[in-house]
A protein has these predicted regions:
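Feature responds to low-complexity, polar/acidic, surface-exposed segments characteristic
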Residues: 2-30, 43-59, 66-92, 99-120, ...
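A short amphipathic alpha-helical interaction element
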Residues: 33-36, 65, 97, 126, ...
Length: 201
């Protein structure tokens, strides 16, 4: 799920719904990839690749979220983060997400450009976005059933509990329950999550 809006990415150059590396309808991410691609949420690169196993960075995630939200980014012309160039491909998206309270930085002055986003951070950002959009986030799953419950950061537990209940997150292992909160999100996983998120918006 990495490589979102790479500098080399060419939007709408390739035929719609056609990625050379997403061709098997039996793959768990197949429908989600084409769902998101058809709506302009996540694009491929100039080689016609979606890169389903690619890692997603923090700035790539907020760019996708902005697309999902249909955000008007034209008014976001400045940012407090010293590692974000407002005229970059992600600058206004980061400013939008931060200004509206969806995402914070990794420190007071740094957003964390180039850092991969993990599952608990993704859940937290979506949770904040959902709250501010008036989506009911009151129903939450019992996270103590997961073997790595103790590894979930305290600041993300409510968000993760909501995300699990909403079907956005689940166990990363089919043999036992493990939430893997620190695991980096892939492009394929992001496509699946955003397709599911659309159903509860």
């Amino acid at each position: 799920m990495c490589g979102e809006l790479l500098d080399t990415e060419i939007i709408n150059k390739l035929p719609k719904n056609e990625f050379y590396d997403v061709i098997n309808p039996e793959d768990w991410y197949y429908n989600a990839v084409y769902y998101c691609a058809s709506r302009g949420y996540i694009q491929g690169n100039e080689k016609g690749q979606f890169m389903p196993d690619g890692k997603l960075t923090r700035e790539q995630f907020v760019v996708i979220l902005g697309r999902v939200a249909g955000a008007d980014l034209s008014q976001y012309t400045e940012t407090k983060f010293t590692d974000v160039k407002i005229n970059s491909w992600y600058g206004s998206s980061v400013a939008w997400a931060n200004k509206n309270g969806y995402v914070n930085g990794i420190s007071k002055c740094k957003f964390g450009v180039g850092k991969n986003i993990d599952r608990e951070s993704l859940a937290t950002i979506l949770y904040r976005y959902a709250q501010k959009q008036g989506i009911d986030v009151s129903s939450k799953a019992d996270l103590t059933v997961y073997s790595d419950y103790a590894k979930i950061s305290s600041w993300s537990k409510d968000a993760c509990a909501w995300a699990v209940n909403a079907g956005l997150l689940g166990s990363t292992n089919t043999n036992y329950l493990i939430l893997s909160p620190k695991m980096t999100v892939t492009r394929a996983q992001a496509a699946k999550i955003f397709m599911s998120f659309d159903s509860i918006k």
